[in-house]
Amino acid sequence: NPFTGLSTNTPTEWHRLTMAVLAAGGDPTNVGGHDLIADGTYNCLAGDPSNQGMNGAAWALLALDSNGYEVPAEAEYTREKLINDILKKEVPGGGWSMNDTARTLEVDITAMVVYALAPHASENPDVQATLDRALKVLRDEISEDGDYASGSDYNCESTAQVIIALTSMGIDPTTVTNASSGKN
């Protein structure tokens, strides 16, 4: 591990650092001579990003797409592999959960996956169909007050994740309403 303190069990640490370096105007492919994109995503030193659940796969895809990074043909974890892993782990009825064996969706994870997959919808009909199901279940999850919950706790973080997901799909979040109350 070239970065003291970065976990080799949680690839999202690498992905968050990638985003932070990029946001600060740096180059994640050369941080002190180390390549966070290669080591944290497509040749992931922490192992298969999907081993950290949907969070790992989604954030690996977000890191790769954050600046349109090229992925070598011989890479272990390509965009295609990450997308296929995500699509295979959709819960019945649409959406995703952090846990690969869960049978019900988690709003936060579903929203993260939506904005990770959004750039790939136009090039892959399976991605678009999966996103359509996810958007439907997110619309179904809105409370009477227009909020979203993580578990049974309505909170601004879950609502913010859904807002990001909706806008990544070109949907104005103020147009998504609860069917019974009409609130958004």
Language model: regions and residue ranges:
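Buried hydrophobic core positions in alpha-solenoid tandem helical repeats
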Residues: N1, G40-T41, L82, I86, ...
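An alpha-helical repeat/solenoid feature that recognizes helix-turn-helix modules
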Residues: T4-T29, D48-A75, R79, P92-D132, ...
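Asp-box/WD-like beta-propeller blade repeats and closely related beta-sheet repeat scaffolds
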Residues: L36-G53
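Conserved loop-to-helix junction within protein kinase catalytic domains, corresponding to the end
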Residues: S180-G182
